[in-house]
């Protein structure tokens, strides 16, 4: 997993709290909690915020790539939580990434969010995506943050540059409405499929999930009932579930690229229904706190 990392600062009427975060970092944690061996390339400092990030990575059994802890300062993201649990963000960051060596055992490389569209790190991300495509499935979640992007038109160019390099793309309806104001979600998804991915998945909050493949499959999945505490990390947990589900279905890895493109409706529906459950568990508790297999009532993997 290729990631920016941050200390998330949560502000409500209650006292301010700090937790480790960053979208692909959350995905890595979610995958690890689902029993997958996960490696993270990121950037943070040996400071108070960085130690929070390191402890979180190590406590979840994630392998940290060398040089990930050599930043001058650790980025922070301040999440302001509304009464309905929706989060808005303010960021304080400057960052780059260490070089990632992709081993022959790598099955999937995931990246997204700030890492993929903020200079200078975005150039490293694109390089990793290009190199990874030769031996692994490449997945991407733009996780749009309008406060850090100039305007939809320039943001589309940056994000579609990564979309074209990916096999699987996940985005929220809010992402797409900001990037393509006034356009239909399915129309946007088909445009992205034309750029190269085999699968595009769109999360729509309480309205459910849309999924389209470049072979013409189109699915709508209902959301899973949940009592929302806050929405922080919900999309990242969903992404972890999507990767885990595709992994279990033997649809990840360069040797399975054709199988991924030809995924059948029943398999994709099963995977996305479980993803909805994973997202529902995450929004039912505070912070980016993805579920374990035990939370899902599933047996641990050997």
Which functions belong to the PLM regions below?
Residues 2, 101-102, 161-162:
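Structural alpha-helical scaffold elements that stabilize or flank donor/cofactor-binding regions
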Residues 108-190, 197, 206-208:
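Conserved beta-alpha-beta core of the PfkB/ribokinase-like small-molecule kinase fold
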Residues 36-116, 134, 138, 300-302:
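Conserved N-terminal subdomain of the carbohydrate kinase-like
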Residues 14-23:
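A short, glycine/small-residue-rich beta-strand->loop->alpha-helix junction that serves as a flexible
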Residues 19, 28-37, 245-247:
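Alpha-helix C-terminal capping segments
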Residues 24-33, 128-130:
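Histidine-anchored nucleotide/phosphate-binding helix
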Residues 181-302:
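Conserved phosphate-binding/catalytic region of the ribokinase-like
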Residues 1-6, 10:
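Single conserved hydrophobic/aromatic residue that forms the stacking wall/gate
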């Amino acid at each position: 997993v290729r990631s920016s990392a941050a200390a998330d600062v949560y502000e409500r009427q209650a006292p301010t709290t700090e937790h480790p975060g960053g979208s692909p970092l959350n995905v890595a944690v979610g995958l690890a909690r689902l029993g997958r061996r996960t490696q993270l390339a990121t950037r943070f400092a040996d400071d108070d915020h960085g130690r929070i990030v390191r402890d979180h990575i190590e406590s979840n059994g994630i392998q940290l790539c060398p040089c990930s802890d050599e930043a001058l300062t650790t980025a922070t993201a301040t999440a302001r939580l509304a009464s309905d649990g929706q989060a808005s963000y303010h960021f304080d960051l400057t960052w780059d990434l260490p070089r990632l060596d992709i081993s022959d055992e790598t099955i999937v490389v995931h990246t997204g969010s700030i890492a993929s569209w903020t200079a200078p790190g975005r150039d490293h991300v694109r390089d990793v995506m290009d190199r990874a495509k030769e031996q692994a499935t490449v997945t991407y979640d733009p996780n749009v943050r309008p406060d850090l992007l100039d305007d939809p038109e320039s943001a589309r160019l940056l994000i579609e540059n990564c979309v074209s390099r990916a096999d699987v793309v996940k985005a929220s309806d809010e992402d797409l409405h900001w990037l393509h104001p006034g356009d239909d979600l399915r129309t946007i998804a088909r445009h992205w499929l034309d750029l190269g991915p085999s699968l595009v998945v769109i999360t729509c909050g309480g309205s459910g999930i849309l999924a389209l493949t470049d072979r013409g499959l189109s699915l709508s999945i209902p959301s899973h009932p949940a009592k929302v505490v806050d929405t922080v990390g919900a999309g990242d947990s969903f992404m972890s579930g999507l990767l885990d589900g595709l992994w279990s279905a033997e649809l990840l890895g360069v040797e399975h690229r054709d199988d991924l493109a030809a995924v059948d409706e029943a398999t994709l529906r099963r995977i996305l229904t479980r993803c909805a459950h994973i997202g529902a568990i995450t929004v039912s508790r505070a912070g980016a706190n993805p579920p374990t297999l035990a939370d899902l009532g599933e047996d641990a993997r050997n």
